[in-house]
């Protein structure tokens, strides 16, 4: 028993030391990896903004603002695009939780007149070969006379976008109607945010000219 009593404290001390060491290592790893991950995410967003917004010469990422449209519970991040000091449009980071596999995040660009310039899918977990075809499908010309390529759509005349199965004009991805509805939900959310920017857009344009 004497040997056991002398060994137990040593074991506890050893385990405690190991826990402290592991915690320290994890803290260092977290610190080392957090910055690169954040930087990679920022680069991806900057590239998406450039891909979907009208041509600009400012830094939309540095001028971003949070906007809570009427009827929504979550604010969306809005990136103003300016050219020669004039506001030319916005890139809006939108999302939906209605995907077949949950969350889909989309960057949607609009020009100052409310036309949808382009979109870029930032994140999704949709089924390969089905819902994962969102980027390709909604950049292709429709074969049915409906809407498929959403680029250039006058959203003032077209919104809200809905699939043909729901009485709308947008072609759903074959065998992936849920993913199609989810994508349009994200686009419509971005449009509602754009629509709520009227006063903000005027202020931004005025500030740009000063």
Segments predicted by a language model, with ranges:
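Flexible, solvent-exposed loop/hinge segments and secondary-structure transition points
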Residues: 2-210
